[in-house]
Amino acid sequence: MKLKDTKSRPKQSSCGKFQTKGIKVVGKWKEVKIDPNMFADGQMDDLVCFEELTDYQLVSPAKNPSSLFSKEAPKRKAQAVSEEEEEEEGKSSSPKKKIKLKKSKNVATEGTSTQKEFEVKDPELEAQGDDMVCDDPEAGEMTSENLVQTAPKKKKNKGKKGLEPSQSTAAKVPKKAKTWIPEVHDQKADVSAWKDLFVPRPVLRALSFLGFSAPTPIQALTLAPAIRDKLDILGAAETGSGKTLAFAIPMIHAVLQWQKRNAAPPPSNTEAPPGETRTEAGAETRSPGKAEAESDALPDDTVIESEALPSDIAAEARAKTGGTVSDQALLFGDDDAGEGPSSLIREKPVPKQNENEEENLDKEQTGNLKQELDDKSATCKAYPKRPLLGLVLTPTRELAVQVKQHIDAVARFTGIKTAILVGGMSTQKQQRMLNRRPEIVVATPGRLWELIKEKHYHLRNLRQLRCLVVDEADRMVEKGHFAELSQLLEMLNDSQYNPKRQTLVFSATLTLVHQAPARILHKKHTKKMDKTAKLDLLMQKIGMRGKPKVIDLTRNEATVETLTETKIHCETDEKDFYLYYFLMQYPGRSLVFANSISCIKRLSGLLKVLDIMPLTLHACMHQKQRLRNLEQFARLEDCVLLATDVAARGLDIPKVQHVIHYQVPRTSEIYVHRSGRTARATNEGLSLMLIGPEDVINFKKIYKTLKKDEDIPLFPVQTKYMDVVKERIRLARQIEKSEYRNFQACLHNSWIEQAAAALEIELEEDMYKGGKADQQEERRRQKQMKVLKKELRHLLSQPLFTESQKTKYPTQSGKPPLLVSAPSKSESALSCLSKQKKKKTKKPKEPQPEQPQPSTSAN
């Protein structure tokens, strides 16, 4: 069996210089006799001969690193540890060896413990340079990394001295992952309010560092029944009320309880490799800084630690016991396959030993190997495999990333490992994350079901699942969405059913019932959906057995009290005017929602022409770009994000001031979740709807479902600025349309030309989109575009919000000059709306004494 090829292995050089991958040539290559009749057809006339090597030794890479690789090893980042320990053990007695240690750039890392693990401890074999071979893929990665780190440099750096261990460790600090969640500095808060809710002590410590002094209402009502009584929970609360911690803390408690019940005693063997003991004991022994650095990494930047898991060690033991010493020569990676003698170094001829001596040497080697493997098998038994204990299902990828980061922040002192499985990212990297056997997995249904079908060993047995969480459950179980979820729930409730499993279901619109469409109501045998019927249907789809505890903290309006709702009635073509007016008049962190991706792309091009650089977020974007745009939107104070309903649910973006519904959502649930991106955690926020003629029907449905007692107020717009706004939008539309058509035509024509060149055919002018443009027409179009852009640039250079003033003397244009009068920065959209409300409340009080006059005259 051959090791899995890894990135850390150096590539074979094209020169004729021989290289060794852990094999030392003792004898000579012997020619293999082949029957010449086998090559009678003449297809292998260039073949010279076949050679085989039977007399060789296994060389320890750690003993002679200079003879392993002839070229400079690739640089790798690692945590540095001093090499002085090896010198104290007497491994580097010669001064030449000490010089090599000083030259090495990367000092021995934590992975040196795993490197020592595979060295033969017999001094006789040690002198001969024999070594063991690891058959496990991940262990192979570890050893190859260590070999690369100890490889010497070709060039001598005379002026540079070796860094001390403290300096090297301080220089290499792990990079913090980018995220849109605000960083909370270590500030200890009083968490006495959490103690009555049966929160574990490590979680209390993390809550203190995060500054969460008191639980939110949904957390206070959920934690005790979920942790103490172990009840299934159906939780409904407003957006931004802390539902993530309401299900994260009970899940962490369930994992900790399982670890206590299945805790294994530490291994008695003091010489056990640190890489093995760290897998289980590391949950309690590693420092909080390491746990935080490990958990804060995004899926894209996650680096798998070089640790040998129990399952990996068992595979390694099976591989070693199954093969002899001679067979292990073939296990040194795929780079040696088919290369023959070119992969080895021909050293000085060594006198050939007798056959009896060779047999004795082989017996000693195999005996030492078996003894070491027996010790490892005992270590494997001491540490059982960690099953999957917690599973969180979310509808969107961004929400899954956010939930994982929240869980990692709360579980930073518990040692619990988490993993994320979402689409749009590398499947192989997520498989490596699952190889670490995390206790908690946060996933979207599609990628999770894909890995389950591939029968990953960590996802095979879901009967041991202790906690199942379905976030945004009403969206997850909607008909026509997430087909994989129904198959997954069916499997969990049938073949993988666990009666001890706890199910937690949360959403902001869990109990919100909207009216069904007319085409469904007119059908026979249709029942009106109410709150109880919706919950029963939800429980049936998820497979919850028994009576769960229902916690409903939503208002009748379903929105937050601190949210201010407003609207603007306009024509469809006028939506661009009011959107541009609002973004220019009230700058800040604004989130604009639309129902379609095409609308998002058109708005993005239009605003870019107007010197507003918006960020976009929709389903057709690459996942890395989606996460990058979210992070940038949370970092910039004055920024615009154009998004579809992908960003409507669950995202906790800090300090979003305005949510603008460019197109009215189709259902009331989407409206509640869109508006919930602002006014989070007792902060104020504004929700603005641009209502066109085609949006009136959806607006009335939302107004009726949310049971609004008062009419939504109109947003105040200063009409004196609209003429300038319309002129800018008119020019921007012409430029955007022309550029879009030209781009589409060039894209289509380029594809047609490439296809014709591949087929070797000639194209006709009719096949070009818009016809094949002449040079004169193209020059005329470009000249027209320059004129439009120059005119728009002139308008954009002038201030938009100005006030006219009277002058004593006539002007050249015959019009009064416009002087700049910028609005005060302290005046926000919320303050303008509140002023308008105060004016309306004062007006009806003035004409009250005049009302009884008509009644007296009638008498």
UniProtKB/Swiss-Prot annotation:
Subcellular compartments: Cytoplasm; Nucleus
GO MF annotations in UniProt: ATP binding; ATP hydrolysis activity; RNA binding; RNA helicase activity
Cross-link (Glycyl lysine isopeptide (Lys-Gly) (interchain with G-Cter in SUMO2)): 370, 624, 808, 825
Keywords, alphabetical: Acetylation, ATP-binding, Cytoplasm, Helicase, Host-virus interaction, Hydrolase, Isopeptide bond, Nucleotide-binding, Nucleus, Phosphoprotein, RNA-binding, Ubl conjugation
Biased composition (Polar residues): 106-115, 799-814, 823-833
SMART domains in the cross-refs: DEXDc, HELICc
Tissue specificity remark: Ubiquitous. Most abundant in heart and brain, but with lowest levels in thymus and small intestine.
Protein name: ATP-dependent RNA helicase DDX24
